[in-house]
A protein has these predicted regions:
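Conserved structured core elements
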Residues: 16-23, 106-111, 138, 152
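Conserved GNAT acetyl-CoA-binding A-motif
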Residues: 91-92, 120-134
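Short conserved micro-motifs at the rims of enzyme active sites and ligand-binding pockets
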Residues: 65-67, 104-107, 141
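Conserved beta-strand-loop-alpha-helix junction that forms the acyl-donor binding cleft
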Residues: 99-104, 130-140
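A conserved beta-strand-loop-helix scaffold within acyl/acetyltransferase catalytic domains
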Residues: 1-98
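Conserved catalytic-core motifs of GNAT/GCN5-like acyltransferases
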Residues: 129-131, 145-161
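Conserved acetyl-CoA-binding loop-helix of GNAT-fold acetyltransferases
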Residues: 91-99, 104-120, 146
Length: 162
């Protein structure tokens, strides 16, 4: 998670993760993750230092829509479990991708996607959904030019003094 802090530190409104937050994320998400959908890039010339990572999860969106009333019990939890354990969805969510600044524009993203896309095909995912990204972050926006991609959602925040 040190890579997360280093990678995102210059993004608008990003707050460094504390040790407590890191522990919480590891216990809540990483322990439940399918490690085939998590990848890392190491620099063998720098003592196998981790320089980039990618974390993805099967999308729970369709399962939660199917539940409809929002109740996990008595049977809603089974739909969520099918996604978590058996990947019964056609969409994967790209949760986090991070590359240390000194390794950007050197192919680290390509290595991340080369590994992850192979796993996505193996699991039968047809779509990948990226989490919100700043439109002004040209570094992250430019990576999509090499893939068949479509921006179909925009998030906006507005301020108004009351």
């Amino acid at each position: 998670f040190e890579i997360v802090n280093e990678t995102y530190k210059n993004l608008y409104d990003f707050q460094q993760l504390t040790e407590k937050q890191i522990d919480e994320y590891v216990n809540t998400y990483i322990k439940k993750a399918d490690l085939n959908l998590v990848t890392g890039v190491v620099d063998g010339n720098a003592g196998n230092k981790l320089v980039a990572f990618g974390v993805s999860f099967p999308s729970f969106t369709d399962a939660l829509r199917e539940i409809g009333d929002g109740k996990l019990f008595p049977t809603g939890w089974l739909k969520v479990l099918k996604v978590l354990k058996w990947h019964k969805t056609d969409t994967v969510d790209l949760l986090l991708i991070g590359v240390l600044p000194e390794y950007r524009k050197k192919g680290a993203n390509a290595l991340i996607f080369a590994d992850l896309i192979e796993q996505y095909h193996r699991y039968g995912f047809k779509w990948a959904e990226a989490m919100p990204q700043m439109e002004t972050n040209t570094g992250v926006q430019s990576q999509w030019q090499y893939l068949e991609s479509e921006q179909h959602r925009r998030h906006r925040c507005y301020k108004k003094k009351i």
